Amino acid sequence: LEEREPEPKGELDYTNPYTLLVAVALSAQATDIGVNRATKGLFKVVATPQEMLNLGEDKLKQHIKTIGLFNTKAKNVIKAAQMLVDNFDGLVPKNREDLEKLNGVGRKTANVVLNMAFRQPTIAVDTHLFRVSNRTKMAPGKTPLAVELKLEKKIPKEFSLHAHHWLILHGRYICKARKPSCPICPVNDLCQFKGKTKLHN
């Protein structure tokens, strides 16, 4: 996976740690393409928590109304912005515990921000990574947390920074849910997916 993508990048558009936090929070049950479309205009007028508060919830909703659950997400983004201003000097925290105190921010969102904004070797288990880990038997688990903890133990230190992106992109474009592209998979020989031989058409 490293050979194919030495410096993997996430597919959400952002300009700084705060706009990344907002984009990731908006991406729950939405596509990155849809989020990028919505934040294109938003991030031209908002780059900090204070600017988000100045914009206000109603105008924020206008920017993100094409995204699922936009009413709830708008409320959470505004509340999180207020917490950042009140408790963190308007800066995005660099640790999971404080990030998870923010409205609308769970472990997965916190891990994405820590990894992408602050280059910490965290693993954010989304649906793609969860599927890849279970399908290949690399780190099978019944919950995202179980998969995350197994991957943390298994992944060598030198790969830990980029592992989460490699696996997500692999799940999104190769090891897809319905029709995995097993014949072109770079790790086909290492995979324990029993159904893969049937898919060589």
Where are these regions (language model features)?
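Catalytic cores of DNA base-excision repair glycosylases
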Residues: E2-N201
